[in-house]
Structure formats: structure tokens, C-alpha cells
């Protein structure tokens, strides 16, 4: 059982205007969290807080302190490696074909730029892959507010996808250190993609989700090639980053190959969700009419 400890709070019924200077200067300890939010075991820091918001102290099942602030123990999971990696949506309609060939066209410059540097390729892929879920979730959130209706859980499902993809990036940042020009490329690619996807989702959610479905199929292919290079010895099979071991509940002696396997499984789950979404639209329904696959990965 995961445990969260909160410091005991004083009376909170008084107005903040009535609080005296001593309360204003009260220091609230940061619970040993690293300033970076990554929880890397660095020095403890404290903050001066007028508002008295208590930091939580999270412990593992064995009672030891949880060191990550960017995710919590109840958000970790074991990846389902049994998922079918070969599934493919054959494009039949005009929108399907447009989505398919758009993704295929985007693959060529990526192949040319990264070639067989799969660590950097994975890092760049995840900076883009984390965008659609956030954009789609935000637009569905606004739609839910405008129409005074539930989303069927799709807001949460898409935001979960975005967070999961972001954790992929945080993991590969530990493995592949990007050069300055690769960081600059992230600014350019992300700036273009987030706006393009935003407009696409406004015009046609089913096209937007289909594009992501095909992007995830390409991601599965990329990680499969990554595994082949690891097996050939062309890429060093280094120990798995600590963040990956805790996030996917991997054994302590896990390696980069184990990380790539679980990431590829995640991408296969995202593929299924994003191909499922346009199928709902094609059958004359809205996403809210079909329960969202929350926690599917």
C-alpha cells in the first residue's frame, strides 16, 4: 500500500488577511524533494510559504521514501508485453488514405536525419508523440464545458496518453543526450506540429486520431529496429535508467533492451486507442457515447 503523509496543519478558518507576520514567515519543508522535480536524491530544500500548502511525503510499499516528484507510485505499472504488435488498419476511406500517406511522407526526412541513431530518434519521436493526447484532451475538455456534457472518460484517457509519452521522453533523455541542434529542432518540429494538429482536430477529430494511429504504427516499427540494433551489438545495452525501473516496475538489473520493449508495448496500446476513436466516429457516434479505455496501457 502506498502511503502519503501530510504535516499537521494549524487552524485554517481565519481569513488570510488576519494572519499575523509569524504565519507569513513560516517555513514549509519541501519533504526532501529535489528542486528539479525529478527526485534524484539531491539535497533537501525548503520554501517560505504564506499559504501553508503542505508537501506530501510518499513512501513505497516497503516503507522507503519515494524519490520522484514527476510521477507517483500509484501511477506506475507493469507493461503488457503480450499485445499484438502486428495489427494494422488498412486505409479504405479518403481520410484514412490521407492520414496514412501523410505519416509515410513524414517518415522519410526522419530516416534521413537520424539514420540508425535510434536513441536520438526515439527522443525526437517522443517530443512529438506527447502532443496529440494533450491537444485532443484540451479540446474535448473545452467541448465538455461548452455543451455541459460528460466526455465518456476520453479527456482522462487522452491526457493519460500524453503523460505516458512524456515519461518515454524523460526516460530516453537519460540514454541519448541531445546535441544543441537537436534541441533546436525540437522547438521547430513541436511548434509546427502542435498548431497543425490543433487545427486538424478542430476540423476532423477522426482524421486527427487516425493520423496518430498511423504514427504509433511507425513508432512500433522504429522501436523494433532499435531492438535489432541492440541485439546485433551496434548499440550498447546499458543499464536501464532508474526512472524507467520505477515507472514500469522493472527488475533492478534491467537494461536498455527491457526499456525499449515496454515502450514499444505502450505505443501499441496508443495505436489501438487512436484507431478505435475514429472507428467510433465512422459508426455515427461520438466519443462520449463509447466508454474510454482509461488505463488501457
UniProtKB/Swiss-Prot annotation:
The record's EC number reads 1.10.3.11
Q: Which residues bind Fe cation 1?
A: 126, 165, 168, 267
Q: Which organism is it from?
A: Nicotiana tabacum
User: What is this protein's function?
Assistant: Catalyzes the cyanide-resistant oxidation of ubiquinol and the reduction of molecular oxygen to water, but does not translocate protons and consequently is not linked to oxidative phosphorylation. May increase respiration when the cytochrome respiratory pathway is restricted, or in response to low temperatures.
* Subunit-structure text: Homodimer; disulfide-linked.
Q: What is the reaction catalyzed?
A: 2 a ubiquinol + O2 = 2 a ubiquinone + 2 H2O
Key words, A-Z = Disulfide bond, Electron transport, Iron, Membrane, Metal-binding, Mitochondrion, Mitochondrion inner membrane, Oxidoreductase, Respiratory chain, Transit peptide, Transmembrane, Transmembrane helix, Transport
Span-the-membrane segments of this chain are 122-142, 184-204
What is an example of a GO molecular function annotated in this UniProt entry? Answer: superoxide-generating NADPH oxidase activity
Q: Coiled-coil annotation: which residues?
A: none
Name of this protein: Ubiquinol oxidase 2, mitochondrial
- Entry's localization field: Mitochondrion inner membrane
Q: Which GO terms describe its cellular component?
A: mitochondrial inner membrane; mitochondrion
Chief subcellular location equals: mitochondrion
| Binding note for cofactor | Binds 2 iron ions per subunit.
Q: Where is this region: Disordered?
A: 17-43
> Which GO BP terms, alphabetically?
alternative respiration
What protein family is recorded? Answer: Belongs to the alternative oxidase family.
